[in-house]
Amino acid sequence: MAIQLSKGQRIDLTKTNPGLTKAVIGLGWDTNKYSGGHDFDLDASAFLVDAHDNCVNDLDFVFYNNLEHPSGGVIHTGDNRTGEGDGDDEQIIVDFSKIPAHIEKIGITVTIHDAEARSQNFGQVSNAFVRVVDEETQNELLRFDLGEDFSIETAVVVCELYRHGGEWKFNAIGSGFSGGLAALCRNYGLQV
């Protein structure tokens, strides 16, 4: 039975799940019926950051144009441009054993592609969630439903995976940003 988290809750991933080395971070969402006549393309990304909350270089940013971190520790399984259907819309696979030692945190985010041009925002998104699945057993370990707390935001930091005392933990963030992917990149120390 998966643990249901609320915004701000933290939970130990690797300590409470001995043997967990690879996790599937599944992200899903629905878009409301009215979307202004444009396709709604949401994109999941991962920012691998150091102790200063910054990506060391552009390769620490895993997204639809850079599907795999050089370490092999974070892999994006590909862009879903419609969000149609049930279950995960996009997935990011994290192999904790391959994450470089200088990486302290992995920020998992979702943005709306071309949000400003299409007049779209997270106020038009519902049923957004993130879940963590043990890749080996396929057991869902935890789930965080984001709720309907957004309006004008075009980017969301959904959660963070972070190191603590040799273990990996999960932090349910659910924090919205205006300014889309560019704002998130700046937040994590990347030049855009």
Swiss-Prot record:
Segments crossing the lipid bilayer: none
Pfam short name (any one): TerD
Signal peptide extent: none
Domain of life (superkingdom): Bacteria
Record family assignment: Belongs to the CAPAB/TerDEXZ family.
Protein name: Uncharacterized protein YceE
Taxonomic lineage of the native organism: Bacteria, Bacillati, Bacillota, Bacilli, Bacillales
Gene that specifies this protein: yceE
